[in-house]
């Protein structure tokens, strides 16, 4: 199994798809890496030569991927929360950040319903 950026990429998949298993590399960036390195995107990972795997490793190091990217995103959210802006407060309260309505929707973000007993008439 080829190991790139600390991730074992699946052997049976095409290289173009297998690279997307790395956090921070999508299909577009995968195609860019393959065109820069000159590796055929239709070949399977198990058929890659060691030199091809090494080329892909070096190319993937040019991008912020995996742990570094996760840390960067976490720090960006923490910064928003620390400065107390609206987006940071919404993140802290687990509410939608981008202006969506919350009266009837946003169940995913708010969690399951908390039933409130009705008042007797």
Curated annotation (Swiss-Prot):
<keyword id="KW-0687">Ribonucleoprotein</keyword>
<keyword id="KW-0689">Ribosomal protein</keyword>
<feature type="compositionally biased region" description="Basic residues">
    <location>
        <begin position="100"/>
        <end position="121"/>
    </location>
</feature>
<dbReference type="GO" id="GO:0019843">
    <property type="term" value="F:rRNA binding"/>
</dbReference>
<dbReference type="InterPro" id="IPR019980">
    <property type="entry name" value="Ribosomal_uS13_bac-type"/>
</dbReference>
<dbReference type="GO" id="GO:0015935">
    <property type="term" value="C:small ribosomal subunit"/>
</dbReference>
<dbReference type="GO" id="GO:0003735">
    <property type="term" value="F:structural constituent of ribosome"/>
</dbReference>
<keyword id="KW-0820">tRNA-binding</keyword>
<dbReference type="GO" id="GO:0000049">
    <property type="term" value="F:tRNA binding"/>
</dbReference>
<dbReference type="GO" id="GO:0005829">
    <property type="term" value="C:cytosol"/>
</dbReference>
<comment type="similarity">
    <text>Belongs to the universal ribosomal protein uS13 family.</text>
</comment>
<dbReference type="Pfam" id="PF00416">
    <property type="entry name" value="Ribosomal_S13"/>
</dbReference>
<keyword id="KW-0699">rRNA-binding</keyword>
<dbReference type="InterPro" id="IPR001892">
    <property type="entry name" value="Ribosomal_uS13"/>
</dbReference>
<dbReference type="InterPro" id="IPR010979">
    <property type="entry name" value="Ribosomal_uS13-like_H2TH"/>
</dbReference>
<dbReference type="GO" id="GO:0006412">
    <property type="term" value="P:translation"/>
</dbReference>
<comment type="function">
    <text>Located at the top of the head of the 30S subunit, it contacts several helices of the 16S rRNA. In the 70S ribosome it contacts the 23S rRNA (bridge B1a) and protein L5 of the 50S subunit (bridge B1b), connecting the 2 subunits; these bridges are implicated in subunit movement. Contacts the tRNAs in the A and P-sites.</text>
</comment>
<comment type="subunit">
    <text>Part of the 30S ribosomal subunit. Forms a loose heterodimer with protein S19. Forms two bridges to the 50S subunit in the 70S ribosome.</text>
</comment>
<dbReference type="InterPro" id="IPR018269">
    <property type="entry name" value="Ribosomal_uS13_CS"/>
</dbReference>
<protein>
    <recommendedName>
        <fullName>Small ribosomal subunit protein uS13</fullName>
    </recommendedName>
</protein>
<dbReference type="InterPro" id="IPR027437">
    <property type="entry name" value="Rbsml_uS13_C"/>
</dbReference>
<feature type="region of interest" description="Disordered">
    <location>
        <begin position="91"/>
        <end position="121"/>
    </location>
</feature>
<keyword id="KW-0694">RNA-binding</keyword>
